[in-house]
Amino acid sequence: MRVAALLIGIIGGVIGWCEPAAAAEAPTAPAAPTDWHATVRDFAAKQFKHPAWGYSHSMRDYALARELAAADHVILDDDVLFAAAYLHDMAAFKPWENEKLDHSDVAAGIVDTVLKGTGFPMAKIDAVRGAIRTHMYYRDPVGPEALYLHDADALDWLGAIGVARVMALVDPNGGDPDGPKAVKMLEDNLKDVPARVLSPAGRGRVAPLKAELEGFLRDLRRESENLRTL
């Protein structure tokens, strides 16, 4: 028995020694727990750290999409919405980022690499891809999950949250963007985003959020000599 145990130990050591070292790879979702939602949520919280389009933005998009759909009495597939909301901006982060392509298209193409093995129902992956691909306000969503994610994401560019997100991008060392360029981004959002909110409930949210952003820009210009001292 001792000899057999010794041989097993030696063989195990040799096998372990012969295994090649794992190559450096992009971070992947952890092994599947009982609840795949927790896996995806934890993955997003760990990997997506950014003041404008990080984990907290994904949380807001998910919650607001559900609110808007409920207000419109529309039933959503929560599996599709949850996965799309928490992973829609993954290609804005390294190592998934591709500066030559729209981050929406890149994320839609690779989102399965995160969801596989988590317990997510992969038969729904195409719906997740579609919602991610059209989440930006300048794209046209198809299907309820895509529509309400699109509108939630658009509304997050307006109001006080929209201001906070854009101003968080300002380089504290005077790089790009500076304060005036951030203001230009806010003005562009004010001009372009409202008309692209498409759902009835979403459109109902536009006016007060637009007014908040307009008020901020008006006050900022007044208090900075029309941005000259910003």
Explain the meaning of each model-derived region.
Residues 30, 35, 46-59, 63-75, ...:
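Divalent metal-dependent phosphate-bond-processing catalytic cores, especially two-metal-ion Mg2+/Mn2+ enzymes
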Residues 18-24:
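Boundary at the C-terminal end of the N-terminal hydrophobic targeting segment
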Residues 4-16:
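Bacterial N-terminal signal peptides
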Residues 61, 102-117:
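An active-site-proximal "capping" alpha-helix that borders the catalytic cofactor pocket
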Residues 78-97, 103, 107, 128-138:
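His-Asp-centered metal-binding catalytic motifs of divalent-metal-dependent phosphohydrolases/nucleases
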